[in-house]
From Swiss-Prot:
Coiled coil: none annotated. The lineage of its organism: Bacteria, Pseudomonadati, Pseudomonadota, Gammaproteobacteria, Oceanospirillales. InterPro entries: Heat_shock_Hsp33 (IPR000397), Heat_shock_Hsp33_C (IPR016154), Heat_shock_Hsp33_N (IPR016153), Hsp33_helix_hairpin_bin_dom_sf (IPR023212). It comes from Chromohalobacter salexigens (strain ATCC BAA-138 / DSM 3043 / CIP 106854 / NCIMB 13768 / 1H11). This is 33 kDa chaperonin. One of its GO terms (cellular component) is cytoplasm.
Length: 291
């Protein structure tokens, strides 16, 4: 499976879509952690979903998708940007029993919320929140779109621990170019025949042809996707500054330096006592040089 996302639309209708497949990027996320099988699968669906959402909103910034719960899994989070970089992480309750391999989303997270964050480079951050009231991520996201009175949207997501894939259909606002008022109901009906195995196994163009060969579908050039972490020394320094001078100096006295690790990519960052003093005195001057 090639790590890529493709847009498509149906001529003379107000229906558009996207299809995504992930294998290497998915493996790069999972290789850094020893997650249970059910968590690996849910993270795959989350990665597929955030890639689809990023392509949908076309934001110059980052899109993140979080599931915050009270169950054995406390957090599932995936993030994407317009450059095609993806990353994801899960946090488990250390005292809870490991989830069963085929556990549903609700079985993993218990009472939970889904938080969608749009963080543009320039402009105001936006967050949308919806309660987890369905067993699948796709159904929860469809519920979010329905409740927020946005465009009618349907999603199909699948992951098996090795590969992840997804498809999105969306009904755009009606205009004069739409000469087929029944197109939305018809294309959704065709897509409901899609199985997880087909979504994971078939080439994207083959899959679209199999589903929509009687429609006038126009498929655009694919966009490559990959694992990429946005952590930097400057961002880590900014986060450390939030701990406050007293706490930072206490850590230095106890440990000789402040050391931390990115949860996403496991990059290691070390700040000496001198680095910390520079950070405290001049928080906006940039991160001290790596030692």
């Amino acid at each position: 499976m090639t790590d890529q996302i493709q847009r498509f639309l149906f001529d003379e209708t107000n229906v558009r879509g996207e299809i995504v497949g992930l294998q290497q990027a998915y493996a790069d996320v999972l290789d850094k952690h020893a997650y249970p099988a059910a968590v690996r699968r849910q993270l795959g669906e989350l990665l597929g979903a955030v890639a689809l959402l990023t392509e949908t909103v076309k934001l110059d910034g980052t899109v993140s998708l979080e599931v915050r719960g009270q169950g054995a899994v406390r957090l599932l989070m995936a993030e994407s940007n317009p450059g095609g970089e993806l990353r994801a992480i899960a946090r488990l309750d250390d005292e809870a029993a490991l989830p069963e391999e085929n556990a549903s989303l609700t079985a993993l997270v218990g009472e939970a919320q889904i938080v969608i964050t749009l963080d543009p480079r320039d402009g105001q951050r936006y967050q949308g929140i919806v309660a987890v009231e369905a067993d699948t991520l796709a159904a929860c996201l469809e519920d979010y779109f329905a409740r927020s009175e946005q465009l009618a949207t349907r999603l199909w997501l699948a992951a098996d621990g090795d590969r992840a894939a997804g498809m999105l259909l969306q009904q755009l606002p009606d205009d004069a170019s739409n000469r087929d008022p029944d197109a939305w109901e018809r294309t959704v009906h065709l897509a409901t025949t899609l199985s997880d195995a087909e979504l994971l196994d078939l080439d994207q163009r083959e899959l679209l042809y199999r589903l929509f060969h009687e429609e006038q579908a126009r498929v655009f050039e694919p966009k490559a996707l990959r694992f990429g972490c946005t952590c930097t020394r400057e961002r880590i320094a900014s986060a450390l500054h939030g701990l406050g001078a007293d706490e930072l100096r206490h850590i230095v006295r106890e440990q000789g330096a402040v050391e931390t690790q990115c949860h996403f990519c496991h990059s290691h960052y070390r700040f000496t006592a001198a680095d910390i003093e520079t950070l405290i005195e001049s928080p906006g001057a940039g991160a001290p040089t790596l030692h």
